[in-house]
Amino acid sequence: MRKVGVGFDYYGNVVIVGDIVKARFKLDNPWKVIEIYMIDINTYNYHLGKGTEDIWINYKEVEFVSHDDGSCILANWI
């Protein structure tokens, strides 16, 4: 497992979970991305946080994480 992203875009904005994913996983606002790991080819483990809660979600699409307008996908590649 390799860390491939953190929760900030190129401009330093916090990356939020987009509308499509919120609906698919029944997440309410304001879930934010903490870190992103690549598990396998096109399979990612997303660490999300909201207040004092955090969850891990596996997902096969890189587009899992984005601003609602699609301006950020995986940011700050490490």
Short names for language-model regions:
Residues 1, 50-78:
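Intrinsically disordered, low-complexity, charged/polar segments
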Residues 6, 35-38, 63-66:
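Intrinsically disordered, low-complexity segments enriched in glycine/proline and serine/threonine
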